[in-house]
From Swiss-Prot:
Disulfide bonds: C269-C305, C273-C310, C284-C295, C362-C396, C366-C402, C377-C386, C417-C452, C421-C457, C432-C442, C475-C510, C479-C515, C490-C500, C530-C565, C534-C570, C545-C555, C880-C917, C905-C919
The keyword Phosphoprotein is assigned to this record: yes
Protein's name in the database: Adhesion G protein-coupled receptor B1
Region described as Indispensable for interaction with MAGI1: spans on this chain: 1574-1577
Lineage: Eukaryota, Metazoa, Chordata, Craniata, Vertebrata
Compositionally biased spans, kind Pro residues: 1385-1430
Protein's UniProt keywords contain Protein biosynthesis: no
Subunit architecture: Interacts with ELMO1 and DOCK1. When bound to ELMO1 and DOCK1, acts as a module to promote apoptotic cell engulfment. Interacts with MDM2; the interaction results in inhibition of MDM2-mediated ubiquitination and degradation of DLG4/PSD95. Interacts with PARD3 and TIAM1; the interaction is required for correct dendritic localization of PARD3 and TIAM1 and for dendritic spine formation. Interacts with MAGI1, MAGI3 and BAIAP2. Interacts with PHYHIP. Interacts with DLG4 (via PDZ domain). Vasculostatin-120: Interacts with CD36. Vasculostatin-120: Interacts with ARRB2.
Entry keyword set: Cell junction, Cell membrane, Cell projection, Disulfide bond, G-protein coupled receptor, Glycoprotein, Immunity, Innate immunity, Membrane, Myogenesis, Neurogenesis, Phagocytosis, Phosphoprotein, Receptor, Repeat, Secreted, Signal, Synapse, Transducer, Transmembrane, Transmembrane helix, Ubl conjugation
Gene name per UniProt: Adgrb1
Organism of derivation: Rattus norvegicus
Signal peptide coordinates: 1-33
Length: 1577
């Protein structure tokens, strides 16, 4: 039994030792040849073909290097698994770089991409010292640890203690792993699980080995039998954790409750050479609860050591010691074996054996224990071997009770993985049995955690991401400028993720030091000024040596040199240009033939040049200065920026910021150029841009192309004409423009991707680029079908180009299939006028067209067809010319053509306005024409004869109409006439602006103003037609109020068009007002609707109003007044005729202005415009009755003025203050009264004052009352005329001795004159008889105001007449009896509204007069009485008392020349007057006069309180009194009027005057009110 137990010992020892030595040998070889990987740096390590190894971080990742890596390659991921053990540093990481660990499948060197990357940073946690050991398991092709770059470049600094860690790696086969590899892997697993917890799970997920207590178990004897890759425990399959028994035992003997303790360390080798033996032991801990139960297995094991041979002289003596074993069975269990084999007991008599050692101390201080003793066998070469055991054991009893320590129960099964896919966690737990009898508690973890990785997550796309950049490489140049590079790797995408975006390499400039530079001469400077200006001298120039630098050699040669100068003769005084101050610059004296130069202004760089020349007589004179070398600061900056970008493009650097430069140049060029040098600078910038576009590092964008073309268009603007002419004088600079455009077409056609067709339309050129294959080419026409130009001038192109498809044939079949052609066509709008070919006899008579084909064809089998439209009228000998710089001067060609040539083109005239050119070369083409000897160059923009005739005829007819209306204005003044005058003015202004706009197309400011005003006057003409219709409608409906309506008419006629134009200009900022071809609204952008919309609205509203007026005219209850109906019909007919004709006129005007070349539109406009003028004159002048009557009256007035019949002969100059109406009627009536009063019939005078209509209430009153007996006459017919009339039937009135007028003063505000004498009784009776007789000669002269005679209350007892308030122009004819003998002093009568005959109530005979009042002291009459207020017709006549001061006897009128027929003629003017218009509204003026009355009452009360009224002077005239009020002379109180202070009872027949008829009232009548009198309905 002892031999059997000892036999397996050498096998168990030698096999692992041999495998371990083999691994150590491979490890040593790997360490010597570690740097065999593909890395490009020394700190890159690739390990492959090795199964075990070790390295430290200090060796693999040195402190002075970054981006170092260590890579372990798996021989075959399907057969092997990589394991790694990392011993972390005790301190946290402190170095600048972080070490990352990950596995990957492969690495693509071309894109620096890692495929299948999986990081282990979460598993290892190298910078976390809380877990000293970390383990991981990798199953992919490569396992790599890489040190990342620190955040900033520079010195990495010393490596901290926390950055030093050590790594062991192991490659284990998945099937049949070696025993030694399993031993090491099981120990790693034991340590991994022992140190695992929730925050640090174990990184070893599974092993192919059967692990048991940290060792590789024997599959034959172990109860844990591995089958394949699983271990069985109690017949249940599990993972590698089932192969472990105890993970908490330590070498100190504190472990589980029973079983073997851990092995001790290996002892010293028994021999120094020749092969020795090392041993180690372990102790057995008895199982709890099983008394006397031992452990199975050996207590001690050994291994060979120091097997190297000993020296020849060395004698070795050895102590042999065999492996011993013990049996854990009890003594009773041995039975007969003790007798058969013998129980270990002391042996004596063996000479070779030493004595037994003393028994050891009992192994247990409590309970049953063991004691051992040993002995050694000392043998020699001549002695025999020892017999018997060398070690003995015996039981020792102890009566003390042993403490029972806490014991762990079995581990629970591992939990499920925390994640269904990807990396997760698993854990298991165990419980501790509590200790007894003072035993120790359980030691070790209660829970273990490890990683689990069931399967990769499907369908979750992982995008690729870049790793950090590597450090910059060393500079490529040891001095001066060099380059550095750095790279980065991409962690490739997974499951369809996106690739890494960006570059994996970066380059930067580096500079280590300056290289030595030898000195180098710069170019010679320009020669200095000559020492003398003439007669021979010298001039000097010098050069500068640049360098040397950084130790280079100096320049060789002279620094300056001299030459002779000034050999010409000195000029005479007349050959020298004097000093001149021109253009704010002082030009010094300069000889003829030389050029003076001064600096450009502050906003530019360069020089201003001015040449001094000799005239034909040999006298020196200054030529105009040229600014060809002056370049503005902005253009100079753009030019320098472009040159910098070109330099970068030539070095192969990518172009950044080129688009911004083009955009900046576009913005600057839109503001115009200041100097001719700006043009050349811009061309230079565009040429450099073309070279940049040609480079492969920059591809032009569509925005760049558009900006490029727009810049060229800005250069060709009309504002730059003078600068182009100046540039042409210095040289043929136009050829640079042609070359620039040709190169641009070439570059764009072949550099832009996906370019098919491109059209660029600007204000001054059109660019068309076509890219097409040669195999499928067709004829190209310019413009192509479906042309949609945005510019007005190019919308209807007048010039055409046809390129035959035969041009694109190369003649080679192979080349035709792959050839691509680019065709560029450029139409220059006004370049021809810039090319300095205008002479006295020749001119470029077309636009300029350029045709380019790239690559250029060998020849043109079919010539180009180009059709040109002529630009000038009156030209002959149209000749096709082309731009050809290679064509030399020809004797047959005109010398002034310059680079233009007529060779290669054939001219085919089409018509008077078009010419076709057939050319066999590709170039730039135009038409050269000969001016007629008697013709001047007539630009199409000059107004044509048709427009001039149409506008002139219309304007003249309308102007004649205005003159007629002005001449008879006082007869026809009305709203309708005002509207017509404004309407005519708007049409006349529109015609003038049309002609002006045709000549100002080149002046942008004037053209914009013309377009805006033309827009305004066109709309105003429509609005005035609408105003006329509105006025007619208001008159028909009876809502016409003169002052208010006239203001609205003006707002509609002028205000509405002004508002529309102001809004349009404000919103568009005047863009669209005027174009390059005409001064009118642009057809683009919708601005034209600002005219069409309002005009259409006016037409629609006018139609609606016309329908309403027509409905009113034809209805039964419509207009009753015949004359008003006739006028309404005339106005409606005028609108129906004029409005359509006006719309047609302006439509044809817009077409004629926008399309100048269409003769049809111009003829239509001329016809419509002329017809419009005639129709307006016909409708509003010839066929209008009012105008006819007004003209007749005007002629009669002229005749009467020639005969002396004027109103200027009135008394006291009153005619100068009266209106025309008052003059005529007053003169007529006074003539009739003075000549024969019977001849003045009622029909003659009342017809003049007849109103066309009365309010309904007044009509009812008149219908109910008795027939009227009062008739109206003008208010200014003086009573003096009746007083002295020889045919007045009354005759002189007798004087009544008993009549008197009593001045009553009572509480009333004003005094009243009371008539109570016989004269007033006589007046009452005569008044009654006059009503009964109703003779034709009875009449009443009333003021033109609308006074009303109303019936008085019956209870009033007296007839009170207020003499003070009696209007001075009121006269009542009482009787025609021949026996009447009282004077013509009449009481006032009241007038019904509107001057109609009043309704007179019956007059009752007055009661007997009351007894006379007591006598009083007579009060002297005041020096003057307040004059009566002048009514509308009362112009202020003198007092009714004739006297020397009245002027009645001093001035006589000759009225015999005025007949009744003259009055009949004059009455027609005023037949339609409505005197109700004087006040507009009765209510308004009643309120106004009530206010005035209150003021007068207040003034009267103050006057009554102040004593000495008789001595007070007359009050000063108030400001609101009219001028004619000052002409009223004061009059005294009549002699037959008595003043009484006591109050008298009112008379029942008292006639009360209206408030505004009182003496103190003042009618606020202004000039506008007087005009309202003349208003027509």
């Amino acid at each position: 039994m002892r031999g059997q137990a000892a036999a397996p010992g050498p096998i168990w020892i030698l096999a692992p030792l041999l495998l371990l030595l083999l691994l150590l040998g491979r490890w040593a070889r790997a360490a010597s040849g570690a740097d065999i990987g593909p890395g490009t740096e020394q700190c890159t390590t690739l390990v492959q073909g090795k199964f075990f190894g070790y390295f430290s971080a200090a060796a693999v990742f040195p402190a002075n290097a970054s981006r170092c890596s260590w890579t372990l390659r798996n021989p075959d991921p399907r057969r092997y698994t990589l394991y790694m053990k990392v011993a972390k540093a005790p301190a946290p990481c402190s170095g600048p770089g972080r070490v990352r660990t990950y596995q990957f499948d492969s690495f693509l060197e071309s894109t620096r991409t890692y495929l299948g990357v999986e990081s282990f940073d979460e598993v290892l946690r190298l910078c976390d010292p809380s877990a000293p050991l970390a383990f991981l398991q990798a199953s992919k092709q490569f396992l790599q640890m890489q040190r990342q770059q620190p955040p900033q470049d520079g010195d990495l600094g010393p490596q901290g203690s926390g950055d030093d860690f050590s790594v062991e790696y192991l490659v284990v086969g998945n099937r049949n792993p070696s025993h030694a590899a399993c031993q090491m892997l099981c120990r790693w697993l034991d340590a991994c699980l022992a140190g695992s917890r929730s925050s640090h799970p174990c990184g070893i997920m599974q092993t192919p080995c059967a692990c048991l207590g940290g060792e590789a178990g024997d599959t034959a004897s172990s109860p844990l039998v591995p089958r394949g890759d699983v271990c069985l425990r109690d017949g249940v399959a599990g993972g590698p954790e089932n192969c472990l028994t105890s993970l908490t035992q330590d070498r100190g003997g504190h472990g589980s409750a029973g079983g073997w303790k851990l092995w001790s360390l290996w002892g010293e080798c028994t021999r120094d050479c020749g092969g020795g033996l090392q041993t180690r032991t372990r102790t057995c801990s008895p199982t709890l609860g099983v008394e006397g139960r031992g452990c199975e297995g050996v207590l001690e094991e050994g291994r060979l050591c120091n097997r190297k041979a000993c020296g020849p002289t060395g004698r070795t003596s050895s102590r042999s010691q065999s492996l011993r074993s013990t049996d854990a069975r009890r003594r009773e269990e041995f039975g007969d074996e003790l007798q058969q084999f013998g129980f270990p007991s002391p042996q004596t008599g063996d000479p070779a054996a030493e004595e037994w050692s003393p028994w050891s101390v009992c192994s247990s201080t409590c309970g049953e224990g063991w004691q051992t003793r040993t002995r050694f066998c000392v043998s020699s070469s001549y002695s025999t071997q020892c017999s018997g055991p060398l070690r003995e054991q015996r039981l020792c009893n102890n009566s003390a009770v042993c403490p029972v320590h806490g014991a762990w129960d079995e581990w629970s099964p591992w939990s499920l993985c925390s994640s269904t896919c990807g990396r997760g966690f698993r854990d298991r737990t165990r419980t501790c049995r509590p200790p007894q009898f003072g035993g120790n508690p359980c030691e070790g973890p209660e829970k273990q955690t490890k990683f689990c990785n069931i399967a990769l997550c499907p369908g979750r796309a992982v995008d690729g991401n870049w790793n950090e950049w590597s450090s910059w490489s060393t500079c490529s140049a040891s001095c001066s400028q060099g380059r550095q590079q750095r790279t980065r790797e991409c962690n490739g995408p997974s499951y369809g993720g996106a690739e890494c975006q960006g570059h994996w390499v970066e380059t930067r400039d580096c500079f280590l030091q300056q290289c030595p530079v030898d000195g180098k001469w710069q170019a010679w400077a320009s020669w200095g000024s000559c020492s003398v200006t003439c007669g021979g001298g010298s001039q000097r120039r010098e050069r500068v040596c640049s360098g040397p630098f950084f130790g280079g050699a100096a320049c060789q040669g002279p620094q300056d040199e001299y030459r002779q100068c000034g050999a010409q003769r000195c000029p005479e005084p007349h050959e020298i240009c004097d000093e001149d101050n021109f253009g704010a610059v002082v030009w010094k004296e300069t000889p003829a033939g030389e050029v003076a130069a001064v600096r450009c202004p502050r906003n530019a760089t360069g020089l201003i040049l001015r040449r001094c020349e000799l005239d034909e007589e040999g006298i020196a004179f200054w030529e105009p200065p040229t600014y060809i070398r002056c370049v503005s600061i902005d253009y100079r900056n753009i030019q320098m920026m472009t040159r910098e970008h070109l330099a970068k493009a030539q070095r192969g650097l990518p172009g950044e910021g080129v688009s911004e430069v083009i955009q900046t140049l576009l913005e600057i060029s839109q503001d115009g150029t200041s100097y001719s040098g700006d043009l050349l600078s811009t061309i230079d910038v565009l040429r450099n841009m073309t070279e940049i576009f040609r480079r492969a590092y920059y591809s032009p964008t569509p925005g760049d192309v558009q900006n490029f073309v727009q810049i060229i268009s800005n250069l060709l603007a009309e504002e730059n004409r003078d600068k182009w002419e100046e540039a042409q004088l210095m040289g043929p600079n136009a050829k640079e423009l042609f070359r620039l455009v040709e190169d641009f077409v070439d570059v764009i056609g072949f550099r832009m991707k996906d370019l098919r067709d491109a059209y660029q339309v600007t204000d001054n050129l059109v660019l068309s680029i076509h890219k097409l294959p040669a195999s499928g080419a067709t004829d190209i026409s310019f413009p192509m079908k479906g042309w949609r130009a945005t510019g007005d001038w190019a919308k209807v192109p007048e010039d055409r180009v046809t390129v035959s498809k035969s041009v694109f044939s190369t003649g080679l079949a192979e080349a035709d299939d792959s050839s691509v052609f680019v065709v560029g066509t450029v139409l220059y709008r006004n370049l021809g006028s810039f090319l300095a070919l205008q002479r006295n006899t020749t001119v470029l008579n077309s636009k300029v067209i350029s045709v380019t084909v790239k690559p250029p064809p060998r020849s043109l089998l079919t010539p180009l067809e180009i059709e040109f439209a002529h630009m000038y009228n009156g030209t002959t000998n149209q000749t096709c010319i082309l731009w050809d710089e290679t064509d030399g001067p020809s004797s047959s060609a005109p010398p002034q053509l310059g680079p233009w040539s007529w060779r290669g083109c054939r001219t085919v005239p089409l018509d008077a306005l078009r010419t076709r050119c057939l050319c066999d070369r590709l170039s730039t083409f135009a038409i050269l024409a000969q001016l007629s000897a008697d013709a001047t160059m007539d630009k199409v923009t000059v107004p044509s004869v048709t427009l001039i005739v149409g506008c002139g005829v219309s304007s003249l007819t309308l102007l004649m109409l205005v003159i007629i209306y002005v001449s008879v204005w006082r007869y026809i003044r009305s709203e309708r006439s005002v509207i017509l005058i404004n309407f005519c003015l708007s049409i006349i202004s529109s015609n003038a602006l049309i002609l002006i706009g045709q000549t100002q197309t080149r002046n942008k400011v004037v053209c914009t103003l013309v377009a805006a005003f033309l827009h305004f006057f066109f709309l105003s003409s429509f609005c005035w037609v609408l105003t006329e219709a509105w006025q007619s409608y208001m008159a028909v409906t009876g809502r016409l109020r003169s002052r208010l309506v006239r203001k609205r008419f003006l707002c509609l006629g002028w205000g509405l068009p002004a508002l529309v134009v102001a809004i349009s200009v404000g919103f568009t900022k005047a863009k669209g007002y005027s174009t390059m071809n005409y001064c009118w609204l642009s057809l683009e952008g919708g601005l034209l609707y600002a005219f069409v919309g309002p005009a259409a609205a006016v037409v629609l509203v006018n139609m609606v109003i016309g329908i309403l007026v027509f409905n009113k005219l034809v209805s039964k209850d419509g207009i009753t007044d015949k004359k008003l109906k006739e006028r309404a019909g005339a106005s409606l007919w005028s609108s129906c005729v004029v409005l359509p004709l006006l719309a047609l006129t302006w439509m044809s005007a817009v077409l004629a202005v926008t399309d100048r070349r269409s003769a049809l539109f111009q003829i239509l406009f001329a016809v419509f415009d002329s017809l419009e003028g005639f129709v307006i004159v016909m409708v509003h002048c010839i066929l209008r009755r009012e105008v006819q009557d007004a003209v007749k009256c005007r002629v009669v007035d002229r005749q009467e003025e020639g005969n002396g019949d004027s109103g200027g002969s009135f008394q006291n100059g009153h005619a100068q203050l009266m209106t025309d109406f008052e003059k005529d009627v007053d003169l007529a009536c006074r003539s009739v009264l003075n000549k024969d009063i019977a001849a003045c019939r009622t029909a003659t005078i009342t017809g003049t004052f007849k109103r066309p209509s009365l309010p309904e209430e007044e009509k009812m009153k008149l219908a109910k009352g008795p027939p009227p007996t009062f008739n109206s006459l003008p208010a200014n017919v003086s009573k003096l005329h009746l007083h002295g009339s020889p045919r007045y039937p009354g005759g002189p009135l007798p004087d009544f001795p008993n009549h008197s007028l009593t001045l009553k003063k009572d509480k009333a505000p004003k005094s009243s004159f009371i008539g109570d004498g016989d004269i007033f009784k006589k007046l009452d009776s005569e008044l009654s008889r006059a009503q009964e007789k109703a003779l034709d000669t009875s009449y009443v002269i009333l003021p033109t105001a609308t006074a009303t005679l109303r019936p008085k209350p019956k209870e009033e007892p007296k007839y009170s007449i207020n003499i003070d308030q009696m209007p001075q122009t009121r006269l009542i004819h009482l009787s025609m009896a021949p026996d009447a003998s009282f004077p013509t002093r009449s009481p006032p009568a009241r007038e019904p509204p509107g001057g109609a005959p009043p309704e007179v109530p019956p007059v009752q005979p007055p009661p007997p007069p009351p007894p006379p009042p007591p006598p009083q002291q007579p009060i002297p009459p005041p020096p003057s009485l307040e004059p009566a207020p002048p009514s509308l017709g009362d112009t202020g006549e003198p007092s009714a008392h004739p006297g020397p001061s009245s002027g009645a006897g001093t001035k006589n009128e000759n009225v015999a020349t005025l007949s009744v027929s003259s009055l009949e003629r004059r009455k027609s003017r005023y037949a339609e007057l409505d005197f109700e218009k004087i006040m507009h509204t009765r209510k308004r003026h009643q309120d106004m006069f009530q206010d005035l009355n209150r003021k007068l009452q207040h003034a009267a009360e103050k006057e009554k309180e102040v004593p000495g009224v008789d001595n007070k002077p007359e009050k000063q005239q108030t400001p609101n009194k009219r001028a004619w009020e000052s002409l009223r002379k004061p009059h005294g109180t009549p002699a037959w009027v008595k003043k009484e202070l006591e109050p008298l009872p009112p008379s029942p027949l008292e006639l009360r005057s209206v408030e505004w008829e009182k003496a103190g009232a003042t009618i606020p009548l202004v000039g506008q009110d007087i005009i309202d009198l003349q208003t027509e309905v």
